[in-house]
């Protein structure tokens, strides 16, 4: 009686491995089907797609794996990919199974950091927050809004990712240069007034530890109190030490017992067209505003711009020079000054005084100091101007439809506030064509006319012909 039972048990032991061997191919075939890529049509025909499905609350249809029809996405821990699987919901990733023979399922990406929600909870990842939000919407609860990367208790900033860390070279230059960039504020008294009011502002940068600052000549002028504000908020009174109206450069000086950050002059002759540059300054009285661009040409000759007596080549850039940015440094990616922001004509066309001329200007100033010579009094109008040429006139007509139909003269780029030019009625975009009965074709003609105590200017403004009288200021 016992022997048949033994035979049956033995038969079972023999049959079990065989059955398992038969089942494994079936399971493997099913898993293979799940991992096999879907068979996509050669041409997508949306008209043959099934009707747009109604998905679970909180999810919207997405394109299928063939990128043709819209289907409901797979939720967390649901099967994804393969011939039968679906694409995962936004924020989820189709994860490979831990063991062979099992399908891929949707889950949170392995990469990513903690995130703080508006419910003041710290979630392990953005994906985890979104998963809980989907569940909250299904239950009619309020979903959390991601408010910051990192834990909710963190007060510091998130560490830079690889792209920001490796390619954020502009920010590195600004951080290096900004402490040496200063805000130059001019104060003056209004007519019949005794109270000092701000009348003009510009920029500059420190070039020596004893407080020498380079800026534009049109930024500083006579009978004004000049205030310099450093990046750390320290304020100093400044005095003009030297000025060159032809170069549009000035040296001013502050007295400070603190150690001042200094910028080094690079060589503008080493610049290359297409090289990245950064223009820093304080437009609209804002500290350390930066604009970036490239060098359009490193030698835009003064004669090309219509300055017949000019032997200086300007650095043309496409970085924007805003109001108040004048006098700030133009730096390369090493943080060396390769120019002084000077002139903006139109969007994408700005000019800087090359650092090689700034170096020459400082050498001449040093020589004057060694010989005990003070610079002589000079006349000042308060204009940023450019000789008008045919190409420049055509460019200006494209930007300003009411620009006068003229191809020669001197174009007024900017009238400095509180100056003789502004008091006379001159405006931005005016064209000066005659002074004291003599035709004006270059900026040099305007500078030569400053020998007169009074200037009678013929000006074109749109379709109007104006006659203005300007009394130049004397810079002491």
Swiss-Prot record:
The keyword Transcription does not apply. It comes from the Eukaryota. Residues 88-154 form the Kazal-like domain. InterPro entries: Growth_fac_rcpt_cys_sf, IGFBP-like, Kazal_dom, Kazal_dom_sf, PDZ, PDZ_sf, Peptidase_S1_PA, Peptidase_S1C. Residues 36-109 form the IGFBP N-terminal domain. Its EC number is 3.4.21.-. Residues 202-362 are annotated as: Serine protease. Residues 1-31 form the signal peptide. GO terms for molecular function: endopeptidase activity; identical protein binding; serine-type endopeptidase activity. One of its GO terms (biological process) is programmed cell death. GO terms for cellular component: extracellular region. It is an enzyme of class 3 (hydrolase). Keywords: Disulfide bond, Hydrolase, Protease, Secreted, Serine protease, Signal. Belongs to the peptidase S1C family. This is Serine protease HTRA4. The gene is HTRA4.
């Amino acid at each position: 009686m016992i022997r048949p039972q033994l035979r049956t048990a033995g038969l079972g032991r023999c049959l079990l491995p065989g059955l398992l061997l038969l089942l494994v191919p079936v399971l493997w075939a099913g898993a293979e089907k799940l991992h096999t890529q879907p068979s996509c049509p050669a041409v997508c025909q949306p008209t043959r797609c099934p009707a747009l499905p109604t998905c679970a609350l909180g999810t919207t249809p997405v394109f299928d794996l063939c990128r043709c029809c819209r289907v409901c996405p797979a939720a967390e821990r649901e099967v994804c990919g393969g011939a039968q699987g679906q694409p995962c919901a936004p924020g989820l990733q189709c994860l490979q199974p831990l063991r062979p023979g099992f399908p891929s399922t949707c889950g949170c990406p392995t990469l990513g950091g903690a995130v703080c929600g508006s419910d003041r909870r710290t979630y392990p990842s953005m994906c985890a927050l979104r998963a809980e939000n989907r569940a909250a919407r299904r239950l009619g609860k309020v979903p959390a809004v991601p408010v910051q990367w990192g834990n909710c208790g963190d007060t510091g900033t998130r560490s830079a990712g690889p792209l920001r860390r490796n390619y954020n070279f502009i920010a590195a230059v600004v951080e290096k240069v900004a402490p040496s960039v200063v805000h130059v504020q001019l104060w003056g008294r209004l007519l019949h007034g005794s109270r000092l009011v701000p009348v003009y502002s510009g920029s500059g940068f420190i070039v020596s530890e004893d407080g020498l600052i380079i800026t534009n000549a049109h930024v500083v002028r006579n009978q004004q109190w000049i205030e310099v504000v450093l990046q750390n908020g320290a304020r100093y009174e400044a005095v003009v030490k030297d000025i060159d109206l032809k170069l549009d450069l000035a040296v001013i000086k502050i007295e400070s017992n603190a150690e001042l950050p200094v910028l080094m002059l690079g060589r503008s002759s080493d610049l290359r067209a297409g090289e990245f540059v950064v223009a820093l300054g304080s437009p609209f009285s804002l500290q350390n505003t930066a604009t970036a661009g490239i060098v359009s040409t490193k030698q835009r000759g003064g004669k090309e711009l219509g300055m017949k007596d000019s032997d200086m080549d300007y650095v043309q850039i496409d970085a924007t020079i805003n109001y108040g940015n004048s006098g700030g440094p133009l730096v390369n990616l090493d943080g060396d000054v390769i120019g002084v922001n000077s002139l903006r004509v139109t969007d994408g066309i700005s000019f800087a005084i090359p650092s090689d001329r700034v170096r020459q200007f400082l050498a001449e100033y040093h020589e004057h100091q060694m010989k005990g010579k003070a610079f002589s009094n000079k006349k000042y109008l308060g204009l940023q101007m450019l000789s008008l040429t045919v190409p420049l006139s055509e460019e200006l007509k494209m930007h300003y439809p009411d620009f006068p139909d003229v191809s020669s003269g001197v174009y007024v780029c900017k009238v400095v506030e509180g100056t003789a030019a502004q008091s006379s009625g001159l405006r931005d975009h005016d064209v000066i064509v005659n002074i004291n009965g003599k035709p004006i074709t270059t900026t040099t003609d305007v500078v030569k006319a400053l020998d007169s105590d009074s200037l009678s200017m013929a000006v074109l403004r749109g379709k109007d012909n104006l006659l203005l009288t300007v009394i130049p200021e004397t810079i002491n």
